Amino acid sequence: MRITVLGAGAWGTALSVGIAPRHDTLLWARDAAQAAHIEASRDNRRYLPGVALPAALRLTADLDAAIAHAQADGGLIVIATPMSGLREMLARCAASGAGLWWLCKGFEAGTGALGHEVAREVAPAARVGVLSGPSFALEVARGQPTALVAASTDEALRNQAVEAFHSESLRVYTSADPVGVEVGGAVKNVIAIATGIADGMGLGLNARAALVTRGLAEITRLGTALGARVDTFMGLSGLGDLVLTATGDLSRNRQVGLQLAQGRSLPEVLAALGHVAEGVYSAATVLARAQALGVDMPITAAVVAVLDGRLTPAQALERLMRRQARAEGHAPD
């Protein structure tokens, strides 16, 4: 199968490393110098250092050529840019005829749209889906066992994703609920910032467990309000991705929270991180979308208040703990 991966960041490179030995894979990098260096050195030193690229993996900085590569023989295009680049890439690929998958997790800044909503607007006739789940790029690239979910309303496209991505180290499940899969992938980044803050403040494992559990309740409330299935949030893209991102130190969003708890400013944290932490950019959008739907998301609101400087981490914690006691469940709490 011909597969094009658009975006030579950590995730795009990691997925390419996994599929290139089995499929005709072309990895596109926006920067020509970066593409040439990666192809010559067989190492993406900036985003995935120390991982050798397979000889079969080719690189290009020519976007038109990258798209054309997947047009033949019913190929696939995987968009591995940050959420901010999804609209542009979908528009460029809309007429290709290839199946389109994206890896980014978040709500689009400005519009508040999820990936499938962006696709409906700019590529309404395309076959599209989202590939998500608990997955650190470095572990995927190393061939460590990972499970993902391929979500699309197109059954044939879901089956094609299994053929393309499933391997001895990467297990791919399918879902017909892209809304739920996208909400889980987007909001868990915000909850991971909250758990990072709590851990950075030394609040203990009880507090971490409470934030993860009540964070899952927030994710579920928002998702079902948007039309998702409840059981989706008990799966890989919900509970699975939340647990990994909230507790694993390879998580960029968790690292943001840990550093904020140490008193560093957000600009300092982001400069030191050097990579995109989607939760920082989508938190306010998540909250705005929830408020428009009348969905209560107190943990998300606390994270937004810390990110924009209205509350310190300690003040945000105090506000959460002083909330009126309620019954547990998915009703507003």
Swiss-Prot record:
Q: Which GO terms describe its biological process?
A: carbohydrate metabolic process; glycerol-3-phosphate biosynthetic process; glycerol-3-phosphate catabolic process; glycerophospholipid metabolic process; phospholipid biosynthetic process
Which is a Pfam family this sequence falls into? Answer: NAD_Gly3P_dh_C
Please verify whether the record's keywords include Oxidoreductase: yes
Q: Which reaction does it catalyse?
A: sn-glycerol 3-phosphate + NAD(+) = dihydroxyacetone phosphate + NADH + H(+); sn-glycerol 3-phosphate + NADP(+) = dihydroxyacetone phosphate + NADPH + H(+)
| E.C. designation(s) | 1.1.1.94
Keywords associated with the record: Cytoplasm, Lipid biosynthesis, Lipid metabolism, NAD, NADP, Nucleotide-binding, Oxidoreductase, Phospholipid biosynthesis, Phospholipid metabolism
Native organism: Methylibium petroleiphilum (strain ATCC BAA-1232 / LMG 22953 / PM1)
Q: Quote a single Gene Ontology cellular component term.
A: cytosol
Q: Which HAMAP family match?
A: NAD_Glyc3P_dehydrog
Q: Where is the active site?
A: K188 (proton acceptor)
Q: What is its main location?
A: cytoplasm
Describe the family membership recorded for this protein in Swiss-Prot or TrEMBL: Belongs to the NAD-dependent glycerol-3-phosphate dehydrogenase family.
Summarizing the function annotation, the protein's role is: Catalyzes the reduction of the glycolytic intermediate dihydroxyacetone phosphate (DHAP) to sn-glycerol 3-phosphate (G3P), the key precursor for phospholipid synthesis.
Q: Which residues are noted in the entry as NADPH-binding?
A: W11, R30, K105, A137, R252, V276, E278
Which residues are listed for sn-glycerol 3-phosphate binding in this entry?
A: K105, G133, S135, K188, D241, S251, R252, N253
Q: Which InterPro entries match?
A: 6-PGluconate_DH-like_C_sf, 6PGD_dom2, G3P_DH_NAD-dep, G3P_DH_NAD-dep_C, G3P_DH_NAD-dep_N, NAD(P)-bd_dom_sf
Q: Name one GO molecular function term.
A: glycerol-3-phosphate dehydrogenase [NAD(P)+] activity
- Spell out the protein name for this chain: Glycerol-3-phosphate dehydrogenase [NAD(P)+]
Pathway listed for it? Membrane lipid metabolism; glycerophospholipid metabolism
